[in-house]
């Protein structure tokens, strides 16, 4: 989905839509939206939602994998506005050092990985691309603060040790998951994707948009 603001350059929506048949992490709460009041009967349409905070495009707070980590409302918002490098690594099983060692990362604080060509908005695919913990440490050493992926997690679906998540915690990097990068090519972009101020929250859905930089 593309957004155009006046005469400015085109913004691209990289957010997974939230709907009742969307792919959900196994065991998580399915997304549901319902009208609890209607215009006809109550004077206005008023809806409520039920969902996991990790449904769709979202930011993980450190509290997600650390009882003493920051909650989502305590994250520095400036990290989720600014330039981002988008890298294409399509059909890679795991992002490893050979995939990132030669990247030009001077001044790069945000990096997103596009790992697939087909985006299924209805079926959960457990064969997604993960990130090796060594890559996390490498990116942190280069000054990266935020890492995004079009996968639903940086660890495999059957990995209960969450090694990549804990590498992010140790390196003080932040994770954005389930990006919808179908209409985006590799390059430098402006990025906006702010979390909700959910007090004590372990994650938050975001509306993520990018536009190409010169």
Enumerate the predicted regions with their spans:
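Active-/binding-site microenvironments in catalytic and ligand-binding cores
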Residues: 3-214
């Amino acid at each position: 989905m593309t957004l155009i603001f006046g005469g400015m350059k085109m913004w691209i929506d990289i957010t997974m839509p939230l709907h009742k048949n969307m792919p959900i992490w196994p065991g998580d709460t399915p997304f549901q939206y319902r009208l609890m009041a209607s215009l006809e009967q109550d004077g206005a349409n008023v809806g409520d939602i039920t969902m996991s905070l990790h449904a769709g495009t979202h930011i993980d707070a450190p509290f997600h994998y650390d009882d003493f980590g920051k909650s989502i409302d305590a994250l520095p918002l400036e990290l989720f506005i600014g330039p981002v490098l988008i890298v294409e690594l399509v059909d890679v099983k795991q992002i490893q050092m050979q995939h990132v060692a030669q990247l030009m990362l001077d001044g790069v604080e945000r990096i997103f990985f596009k790992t697939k060509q087909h985006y299924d908005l209805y079926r959960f695919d457990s064969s997604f691309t993960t990130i090796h913990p060594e890559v996390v440490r490498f990116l942190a050493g280069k000054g990266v603060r935020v890492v995004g992926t079009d996968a639903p997690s940086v660890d495999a679906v059957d990995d209960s040790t969450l090694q990549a998540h804990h590498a992010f915690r140790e390196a003080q990097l932040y994770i954005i998951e389930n990006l919808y990068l179908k209409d985006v090519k590799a390059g430098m972009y402006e990025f906006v994707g702010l979390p909700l101020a959910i007090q004590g929250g372990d994650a938050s859905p975001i509306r993520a948009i990018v536009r190409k930089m010169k």
